[in-house]
């Protein structure tokens, strides 16, 4: 037995952005918390260059695949029960915004964190590869 078990329920082929397909995510019934992850490095890049299954992401956002991802697009995916919160079903939810060290404009993180706070969505910004404070 263990105190904490992390299970990847929905891969993105190393792309920083995606929306779940019909059959995703596969969250184990014993899970009591879901952590959704989005990489900040998607912001400002074209959907076709940064998203896993770009046609699905573009359709979800109501955009073309050659349009850039905005912080508001990321927020739409985070807050949606068809996006990052799909399958949460009453479990605790945390949005982890990764690669904060890649942000050219730190106001983007501040805007997203403010939206999360206003909406009661627990969110953390950070970088799993580098110290953000260095």
Where are these regions (language model features)?
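Phosphate/Mg2+-binding loops and adjacent switch elements
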Residues: 1-86
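Short coil/turn segments at beta-strand junctions that form active-site/ligand-binding loops
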Residues: 3, 32, 91-92, 121
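A short acidic (Asp/Glu
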Residues: 17-18, 105-107
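Canonical P-loop GTPase G-domain recognition
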Residues: 106-134
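G-domain G4 guanine-recognition motif of GTPases
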Residues: 39-40, 60-65, 80, 92-105, ...
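A structural motif corresponding to the C-terminal end of an alpha-helix
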Residues: 80-93, 119
């Amino acid at each position: 037995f263990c105190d904490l078990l992390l299970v990847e329920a929905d891969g993105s082929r190393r792309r920083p952005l995606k929306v779940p397909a019909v059959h995703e995510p596969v969250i184990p019934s014993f899970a009591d918390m879901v952590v959704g992850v989005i990489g900040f490095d998607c912001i400002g890049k074209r959907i076709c260059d940064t998203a896993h299954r770009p046609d699905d992401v573009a359709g979800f956002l109501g955009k073309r695949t050659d349009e850039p991802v905005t912080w508001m697009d990321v927020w739409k995916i985070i807050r949606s029960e068809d996006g990052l919160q799909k399958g949460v079903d009453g479990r605790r939810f945390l949005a982890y915004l990764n690669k904060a060290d890649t942000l050219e404009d730190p106001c983007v993180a501040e805007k997203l964190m403010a939206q999360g706070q206003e909406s009661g969505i627990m969110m953390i910004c950070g970088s799993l590869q580098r110290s953000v404070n260095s």
